[in-house]
Regions:
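Active-site microenvironments in enzyme catalytic cores
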Residues: 4-183
């Protein structure tokens, strides 16, 4: 199933996409909901960020090719961490797929992007075992993780380099029922 958040006129709602049609739902995908009689052509609505989470996290340094690439750029030997480097991200950085990513005037020349697979968590959880983890995933969407590398190097944290407005494009929709082993 494909879920979206969309705007039609002044109305913002969640919807279910079927082919080229969006059916509005009451509630949200994460709580009780039901389809309404309101349908629109997908081409006639504005797709928004599919979900605005109160908090979200990013797992960095989580694949060998990226670690090797970054080490090569710095002229050092790659060091592979035992676990991903998880960092908090701010929802002010979220922007819909078709919206522009705005590079701040004071940014350096090292603004880079990385395509990401985003796991959308559908139920509140904490300290979940690896075996249970997928039970909490509602679905998947796409993300674009922009980073201002000069700020990352020079600031004491990654906050500004990773959380600048519009630096986290996400969407256009959430797909449920995907098997991560098949991606």
């Amino acid at each position: 199933m494909k879920w979206c958040r969309f705007q039609s006129g002044r109305n913002v709602a969640y919807g279910v996409i079927d082919g080229t049609t969006v059916t509005e739902v009451t509630g949200s995908p994460f709580e009780s909901h039901s389809k309404t009689a309101n349908t629109s052509m997908l081409s006639r609505v504005k797709l928004l960020v599919p979900v605005i989470p109160p908090t979200f996290y990013a797992a960095g340094v989580n694949y060998r090719e990226h670690v090797t690439e970054m080490a090569h750029r710095r002229g050092v030997k790659p060091e592979f961490p035992p676990n991903a480097d998880v960092g908090y991200r701010a929802n002010n950085a979220l922007v819909a797929t078709d919206e522009p990513i705005v590079i701040p005037k004071d940014a350096g020349e090292l603004v880079q992007y990385e395509g990401e697979l985003v796991a959308v968590i559908g139920k509140r959880c904490k300290k979940v075992s690896e075996a249970e983890a997928l039970d909490y995933v509602f679905g998947s969407t796409l993300g674009n993780d922009d980073s201002e590398r000069t700020w990352q190097r020079n600031d004491r944290t990654f906050w500004r380099g990773k959380n600048t407005d519009t630096f986290k494009a996400m969407g256009p929709w959430i797909v449920t029922g995907l098997n991560p082993d098949d991606l």
